[in-house]
A protein has these predicted regions:
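Conserved alpha-helical substructure of the radical SAM core
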Residues: 1-27
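Active-site acidic/histidine clusters and adjacent loop/turn architecture
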Residues: 30
């Protein structure tokens, strides 16, 4: 396993001039990046800020099922308030088509906790391909909203390869237009054919 120093060395190597620029985001994805790693992120942020890498945007791609540790919340709020760090939770809650049980996947109390981070820019992203998926997305949004979670909602077409993606891209765009959702393309599919490291 890489050390925090080695991870930040690698991040710095990938950045122009070793710094975040032009609103570049540090996006932490997974698996589930909030599962078991919350204790490591304060050291990661400290190392990035100690190196003066100009980080202003941090995004966690999460399924919205992991409670934030209180110490980690405090650290995120400190960086948000003292350093202007914009924290985003891209919440891709799993709908029944993914095989997840509703009561395990749609957890408004946990997501509402994410929204306590100072100046957060969070949103939902539901991966859909059928009318039933859209019905489930509506149901999930209603459940979150009834718990006070009112954040933007994106729909993203299913498909890691062009042949599948092209089948439902237009359909999902139409769902968005007709239902007031935002459309999120899988830009890596048409551009890079979802090749490794894209």
């Amino acid at each position: 396993m890489m050390s925090i120093t080695e991870i930040v060395d690698q991040i710095q190597h990938l950045l122009p001039n070793g710094k975040f620029s032009q609103d570049k985001h540090l996006i932490i994805t997974g698996g589930e990046p909030l599962l078991g790693w919350q204790r490591a992120y304060p050291a990661l942020l400290r190392e990035i800020y100690d190196r003066e890498m100009n980080l202003t945007h941090l995004t966690f791609e999460t399924n919205g099922t992991q409670q934030l540790d209180s110490k980690f919340k405090d650290v995120l709020n400190q960086y948000a308030e003292n350093n202007g760090l914009e924290v985003t939770f891209s919440i891709s809650a799993k709908l029944p088509a993914s095989g997840e049980k509703w009561e395990s996947a749609i957890l408004p109390k946990i997501v509402s906790d994410y929204l306590e981070i100072h100046g957060h820019r969070s949103y939902f992203k539901f991966v859909v391909s059928t009318d039933l998926d859209v019905v489930d997305a509506h149901r999930a949004v209603a459940e979150y909203q009834s718990a006070g979670v009112g954040i933007p909602v994106y729909l993203m077409p299913v498909g890691g390869v062009n042949s599948v993606y092209e089948l439902n891209e237009r359909q999902v765009a139409d769902y968005c237009r007709n239902n007031g959702f935002r459309f999120s393309p899988r830009i890596q599919v048409p551009l890079y054919k979802n090749e490794w490291a894209t």
